[in-house]
Amino acid sequence: MASIAVCPGSFDPVTYGHLDIIRRGAKVFDQVYVAVLNNSSKKPLFSVEERIELLREVTRPFPNVIVESFHGLLVDYARSKNASAILRGLRAVSDFEYEMQITSMNRVLDENIETFFMMTNSQYAFLSSSIVKEVAKYNGNISDLVPPVVEEALRKKFASLTSNERNES
């Protein structure tokens, strides 16, 4: 039986930290579904479709990685993919408490799906999509934080937002 994992997240945008976890997960599991959360309570910078497109581009070198979106409960999505594992990255101890709550709830919902935590490579321990967006918004250098295609998408997105703001005033 193939080992299948789901690596969930909002990926708004995907960073080198995310890619580190996906790449390492793809070495451990036969199949990894990168599941882009369609969270209606958040107002993302990129649409789900844009995030999927960027993720597909940057995960192209990994033949056993499939990028899709999902809504609803993660365990339901994992079950629909016959996944026995959820793969999560941890940057710091501060991530652990939140992740333990989610893991405990997922275990209540389906005790057959295990959660695996991978410590993010130390060079990405500080990295978050929020930080990347904040730096990019002010034209800071993000080339060490995100792949080139993501950097370009961020520059275009903020240029269009700035242009729209000027047109509205």
Swiss-Prot record:
Keyword Oxidoreductase: no
Cellular compartment(s): Cytoplasm
Residues the record marks as site: Transition state stabilizer: H18
Binding positions (substrate): S10, K42, L74, R88
Residues bound to ATP: S10, F11, H18, G89, L90, R91, E99, Y124, A125, F126, L127, S128, S129, S130
Recorded superkingdom: Bacteria
Function: Reversibly transfers an adenylyl group from ATP to 4'-phosphopantetheine, yielding dephospho-CoA (dPCoA) and pyrophosphate.
Protein name, UniProt field: Phosphopantetheine adenylyltransferase
Species this chain originates from: Geobacillus sp. (strain WCH70)
Higher taxonomy: Bacteria, Bacillati, Bacillota, Bacilli, Bacillales
Gene: coaD
